[in-house]
C-alpha cells in the first residue's frame, strides 16, 4: 500500500485535484475499462449512471453528500460489458465485491445524508436553496457550501457558508452511524482530500495494477504526483470510524447500507 498526493494536469472542473476523473478517462481511452459506474446529479440529487467515454464522465466531477444507489447498475453493467469499473463510497465498494469488477475506486467518507435532509440543512442553516449551490464539501471538520451570486452586469461572486459537522452529524444516514470504513479499504485505489494540500487528491494505492496505471499517467504528463501525504490525518479519521465497531450490528448495517438499496 502506498500513499500519494496527485493532481490532474488536464483542465477539469473537479472537486479537488481531478485525479479520479483523469484516472477513469485514461482507463476508458486505453481499453482498461469498457464502462464505469459513476454519479451525476439532478439539482444535487445523486443520479448513478454508466459512463463509457471520457466526455460522459464530466457530469460526475463534484461530490454530492446524499445517498446514491450506485450498485443497482452493476448487474446490468457486468452482463453487458467485459471490463467494468465502480466509483463509490466504502459501502458501495463493499457491496461491489460480489461482482467481477476490473477497477474499484473508493472515496473517503465520514458520513452521508438523505437528499431531503441535506436540502433542509442548506436552507435552514444558510438560507440558501439547493439550486443555488455551486459546490459542497466536508473538510476540516466543517460542512461547506459555496454559491455564486451575481455581481455587477455580468460578473459573479463566490459566497461560502460553513458550519461544524458536529452540529449536523446526528442527521446523517443511519448506516453511517455504524460504518467502520473511512478510506474504502476494499477498493483497488482510494481517493479523497484529507492528508493533502488544497487542490490535490490523496491517493491510497492498494495494488500493483493501479500503481502501474498511475506511473503511466505520470510519465505521459496527465497527472502530477508527490509523496507528501499527512498519513496521520487519515489514520485519525480511520480510528474514529473504527469506534463504531462497538455499536455495529451487522444485520442493521446491511439493512440500511445505501449500497444495497
Curated annotation (Swiss-Prot):
Gene Ontology molecular functions: iron-sulfur cluster binding; metal ion binding; oxidoreductase activity, acting on CH or CH2 groups, with an iron-sulfur protein as acceptor
Keywords assigned by UniProt, alphabetized: Iron, Iron-sulfur, Metal-binding
Domain of life of the source: Archaea
Signal listed as a keyword: no
InterPro entries noted in UniProt: Co_F420_Hydgase/DH_bsu_N, FRHB/FDHB/HCAR-like, FrhB_FdhB_C
Signal as UniProt keyword: no
Similarity annotation: Belongs to the FrhB family.
Protein name: Uncharacterized protein MJ0725
Organism: Methanocaldococcus jannaschii (strain ATCC 43067 / DSM 2661 / JAL-1 / JCM 10045 / NBRC 100440) (Methanococcus jannaschii)
Amino acid at each position: 500500500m502506498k500513499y500519494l498526493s496527485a493532481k490532474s494536469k488536464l483542465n477539469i472542473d473537479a472537486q479537488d485535484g481531478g485525479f479520479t476523473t483523469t484516472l477513469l478517462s485514461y482507463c476508458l481511452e486505453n481499453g482498461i475499462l469498457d464502462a464505469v459506474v459513476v454519479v451525476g446529479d439532478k439539482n444535487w440529487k445523486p443520479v448513478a449512471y454508466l459512463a463509457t467515454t471520457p466526455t460522459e464522465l464530466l457530469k460526475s466531477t463534484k461530490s454530492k453528500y446524499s445517498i446514491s444507489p450506485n450498485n443497482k447498475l452493476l448487474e446490468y453493467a457486468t452482463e453487458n460489458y467485459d471490463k467494468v469499473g465502480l466509483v463509490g463510497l466504502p459501502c458501495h465498494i463493499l457491496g461491489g465485491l460480489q461482482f467481477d469488477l476490473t477497477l474499484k475506486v473508493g472515496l473517503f467518507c465520514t458520513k452521508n445524508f438523505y437528499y431531503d435532509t441535506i436540502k433542509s440543512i442548506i436552507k435552514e442553516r444558510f438560507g440558501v436553496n439547493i439550486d443555488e449551490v455551486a459546490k459542497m464539501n466536508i473538510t476540516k471538520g466543517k460542512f461547506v457550501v459555496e454559491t455564486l451570486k451575481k455581481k455587477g452586469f455580468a460578473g459573479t461572486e463566490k459566497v461560502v457558508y460553513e458550519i461544524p459537522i458536529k452540529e449536523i452529524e446526528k442527521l446523517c444516514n443511519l448506516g453511517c452511524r455504524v460504518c467502520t470504513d473511512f478510506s474504502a479499504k476494499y477498493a483497488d485505489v482510494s481517493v479523497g482530500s484529507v492528508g493533502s494540500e488544497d487542490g490535490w487528491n490523496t491517493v491510497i494505492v492498494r495494488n500493483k495494477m493501479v500503481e502501474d496505471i498511475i506511473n503511466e499517467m505520470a510519465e505521459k504528463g496527465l497527472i502530477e504526483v508527490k509523496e507528501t501525504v499527512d498519513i496521520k490525518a487519515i489514520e485519525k479519521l480511520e480510528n474514529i470510524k473504527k469506534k463504531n465497531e462497538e455499536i455495529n450490528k451487522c444485520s442493521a448495517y446491511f439493512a440500511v447500507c445505501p449500497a444495497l438499496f
